[in-house]
């Protein structure tokens, strides 16, 4: 008994000694294998602990997480070589390529010694050549074997600026066909006559990705009442990024940018810089569309005559933030079609910020092609445009531009200045010669001033644009070309309602705990027509659990005035916050509505529902009741919803469906609308797994799902929800970093180990225990490995029903063996863990 106790203590001391020295790489340690022996002193005399004596491990390829300091940069397979130090000690050293270091942010161009001189010349060999990290002064690496972490310690002077992501890390994604779709249909029944009227709308956004190329199309179909359905294609184009130039080339049907001239639809070719490739701190932003609906209404948004967006909104304030961009900064013309047939019309300006560039930065755009009108009767006239802006010293920016067609020529020039604490200001003058159809050429001139500022102390943002038309004869390119129609031979005054001046003002003010205030105002004064203007005030705040918002809008359009005031109050019912009660009052010039509603969500926010009841007091009618019931299901494969709306005179049923699809080399994957850039999550063979981006989006029966709407040229962490994994699946890596280019479908790939979990006791065919520290793995699957403990036990995952394990405890052929197993012959515990034993031959 004394010998047994002494033997156990010795084994315990040896085990903890080994554990304590494993993280230490520099020292040399010697362990006596006899300490691990059982009663038979010579049984483990051949135990090979040389792997641990110097804190080392077997060289080879391991899947590791790569860190640059404390920041995770990558998860990939890295080959490690055994290297000997001048003192004779062995350690593992990674084999990283020059391209990898550049992707991780190292300024490799400043360190040519990373590769031997002959390898710097032979570019085709750089992809596989290991760099010499010692070429960077004070750079080092640490390989934490049991955590599978490779930590790179690089001095800050050897790194690129923090917000400058190397082009080498940008991912063009996979070759794929993608489709976004949106459809809604409504049927209105008039109670007095029984007459029914239906309207249907379908919007399709097909596309194809191959390499850096993106092919995109927008096609819509609209049918209302007894009229025939009509298809309309807004655009079809192919585009790709020129990453080194921070530019983009576009072929086909698109829109010119609206920073110097009004945006123009064209068919042709365009080359210009791409702001999206710049760091996020240098990018511009665009506004959203806000308004107030008096009743359940259809909102249509048009740009340059094209229908961009159509949706049904509930009574009260609405905010549209999911309009697919048309690559244009022109004004958005919004029409609100109320259920009773009345309409609202107003314009949402895109207030382009003051033009200001940092010193040395170049912004340019070149386009040549034909004018692409929305009306097929308008001629497709040849057009061209060129604009250039350059950042000068002293915070100045100079810019020039020109437009040309047979009937129109314009030039613009201006200066911008950054005023430091006082914001940014730019001013320009544009001169144009316009020749309307069947009229003599006329010359016009416009001055424009733009100013924007954010007060850092109060976080107040201002944006002001003012245009003064010096003469009555100034026109833009689209207005002139719209007069050239093929089947209209009448002589008319195309140049009516000429602008005298126009102003757009937007002010945003966060108020901390007191809410948020947003003000917007625009006005257009004409020489021979009534002025048009739009006011808007939105104020929202919280009082405990009570949410309140106040919205006021006044629109004056061609002599018609419309004013709307809305007050909304809502609060949760219960602690779960899945059901809310709300009250809304909407007042216009001729009516006042009081609405009570209940709304909420269920099934992990997948199901949204609402019930509304409204009492209307109009000028000639009082006590008119209306109500609605709506349901919407947001699933992994798209959204589907329905709505019922009634008044004393009509009943209306509507339904909508939307979603997206990606066809890739592994098949078809359905999901929500993509609207730009997306990640394809791959967990092969594991269904029902979500990510941290959206818990409602789960992998399909093959293990694939779509994470939509991620920002291009920015790094994203796609985190797998391991709680969704079934008992027979495990993943060693639960996150994937993606850095997509614009429009890319990038892979967020995970490698699940699907199969059983087992604790296996392994002995050799001569009766000896497998040496402590041996590696046991499935044959031909070295990544799925486990370490054998001092009792010959190994915890294994991802095991098939039958298989063979390879056990290694050294480099020689005599230091490995194989063991067969069958799960059917093993005992399975309550936790799903199999208890196995096997003899290694």
From Swiss-Prot:
Gene name of this polypeptide: myfC
Membrane topology, as annotated: Multi-pass membrane protein
GO BP, sorted A to Z: pilus assembly
Similarity section: Belongs to the fimbrial export usher family.
GO molecular function, one term: fimbrial usher porin activity
Superkingdom assignment: Bacteria
GO CC list: cell outer membrane
Biological classification of the source: Bacteria, Pseudomonadati, Pseudomonadota, Gammaproteobacteria, Enterobacterales
Pfam family, one: PapC_N
Keyword vocabulary terms for this entry: Cell outer membrane, Disulfide bond, Fimbrium biogenesis, Membrane, Signal, Transmembrane, Transmembrane beta strand, Transport
Compartments in which it is found: Cell outer membrane
Signal sequence bounds: 1-26
Function, as annotated: Involved in the export and assembly of the MyfA fimbrial subunit.
Name this polypeptide is given: Outer membrane usher protein MyfC
Disulfide bonds: 817-840
């Amino acid at each position: 008994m004394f010998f047994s106790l002494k033997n156990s203590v010795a084994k315990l001391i040896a085990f903890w000694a080994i554990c304590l020295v494993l993280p230490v790489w520099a020292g040399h340690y010697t362990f006596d294998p006899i300490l691990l022996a059982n009663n038979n002193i010579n049984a483990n005399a051949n135990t090979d602990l040389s792997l641990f004596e110097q804190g080392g491990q077997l060289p080879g390829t391991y899947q590791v997480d790569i860190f640059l300091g404390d920041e995770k940069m990558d998860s990939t397979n890295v080959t490690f070589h055994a290297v000997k130090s001048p003192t004779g000690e062995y350690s593992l050293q990674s084999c990283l390529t020059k391209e990898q270091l550049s992707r991780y942010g190292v300024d490799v161009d400043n360190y040519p010694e990373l590769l031997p001189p002959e390898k710097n010349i032979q570019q085709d060999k750089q992809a596989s050549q290991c760099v010499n990290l010692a070429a960077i002064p004070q750079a080092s690496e640490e390989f934490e074997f049991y955590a599978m972490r490779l930590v790179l310690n690089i001095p800050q002077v050897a790194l690129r600026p923090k917000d400058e992501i190397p082009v080498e890390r940008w991912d063009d994604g996979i070759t794929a066909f993608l489709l976004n779709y949106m459809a809604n249909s409504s049927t209105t029944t008039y109670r007095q006559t029984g007459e029914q009227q239906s309207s249907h709308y379908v919007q399709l956004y097909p596309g194809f990705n191959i390499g850096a190329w993106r092919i995109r199309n927008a096609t819509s179909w609209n049918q209302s009442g007894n009229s025939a359905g009509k298809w309309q294609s807004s655009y079809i184009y192919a585009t790709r990024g020129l990453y080194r130039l921070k530019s983009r080339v576009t072929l086909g049907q698109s829109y010119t940018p609206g920073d110097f001239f009004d945006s123009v639809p064209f068919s042709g070719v365009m080359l210009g810089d791409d702001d999206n490739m710049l760091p996020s701190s240098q990018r511009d932003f665009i506004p959203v569309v806000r308004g107030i609906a008096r009743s359940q209404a259809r909102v249509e948004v048009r740009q340059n005559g094209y229908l961009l967006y159509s949706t049904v909104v509930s009574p009260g304030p609405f905010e549209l933030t999911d309009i697919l961009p048309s690559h244009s900064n022109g004004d958005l013309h919004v029409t609100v079609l109320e259920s009773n047939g009345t309409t609202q019309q107003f314009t949402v300006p895109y207030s382009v910020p003051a033009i200001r560039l940092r010193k040395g930065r170049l912004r340019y755009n070149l386009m040549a092609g034909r004018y692409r009108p929305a009306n097929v009767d308008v001629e497709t006239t040849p057009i061209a445009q060129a604009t250039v802006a350059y950042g000068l010293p002293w915070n100045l920016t100079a810019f020039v531009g020109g437009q040309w067609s047979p009937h129109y020529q314009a030039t613009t020039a201006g200066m911008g200045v950054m005023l430091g604490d006082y914001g940014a200001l730019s001013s320009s003058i544009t001169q144009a010669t316009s020749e309307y159809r069947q009229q003599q050429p006329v010359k016009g001139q416009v001055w424009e001033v733009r100013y924007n500022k954010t007060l850092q102390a109060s976080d107040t943002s201002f944006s002001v644009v003012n245009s003064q038309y010096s003469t009555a004869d100034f026109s833009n390119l689209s207005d002139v070309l719209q007069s050239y129609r093929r089947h209209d031979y009448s002589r008319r005054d195309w140049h009516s309602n000429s602008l005298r001046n126009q102003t757009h003002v937007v002010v945003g003010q966060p108020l901390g705990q007191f809410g948020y205030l947003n003000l917007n105002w625009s006005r257009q004064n004409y020489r021979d027509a009534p002025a048009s203007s739009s006011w808007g005030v939105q104020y929202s705040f919280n009082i405990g659990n009570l949410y309140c918002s106040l919205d006021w809008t006044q629109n004056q359009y061609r002599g018609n005035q419309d004013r709307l005031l809305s007050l909304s109050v809502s609060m949760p019912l219960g602690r779960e916050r899945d059901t809310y009660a709300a009250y809304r009052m909407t007042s216009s010039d001729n009516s006042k509505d009081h609405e009570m509603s209940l709304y909420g969500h269920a099934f992990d926010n997948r199901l949204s529902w609402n019930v509304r009841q409204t009492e209307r007091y109009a000028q000639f009618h009082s006590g008119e009741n209306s109500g609605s019931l709506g349901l919407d299901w947001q699933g992994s494969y798209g959204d589907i919803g329905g709505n019922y709306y009634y008044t004393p005179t009509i009943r209306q049923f509507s339904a909508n469906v939307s979603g997206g699809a990606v066809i890739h080399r592994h098949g078809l994957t359905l999901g929500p609308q993509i609207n730009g850039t997306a990640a394809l999550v791959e967990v092969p063979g594991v269904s029902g797994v979500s990510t941290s981006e959206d818990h409602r989006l789960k992998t399909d029966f093959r293990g694939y799902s779509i994470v939509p709407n991620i920002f291009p040229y920015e790094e994203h962490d796609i985190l797998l929800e391991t709680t969704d994994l079934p008992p027979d699946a495990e993943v060693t890596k639960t996150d994937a970093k993606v850095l997509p280019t614009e429009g890319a479908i990038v892979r967020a790939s995970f490698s699940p180990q699907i199969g059983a979990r087992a604790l296996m006791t392994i002995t050799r065919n001569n009766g000896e225990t497998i040496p402590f520290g041996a590696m046991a793995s499935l044959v031909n699957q070295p990544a799925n490995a486990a370490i054998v403990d001092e009792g010959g036990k190994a915890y294994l995952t991802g095991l098939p029903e039958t298989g063979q394990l390879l056990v290694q405890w050294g480099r020689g052929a005599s230091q490995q063996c194989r063991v067969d197993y069958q799960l059917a012959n093993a005992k399975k515990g309550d936790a799903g863990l199999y208890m196995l034993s096997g003899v290694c031959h």
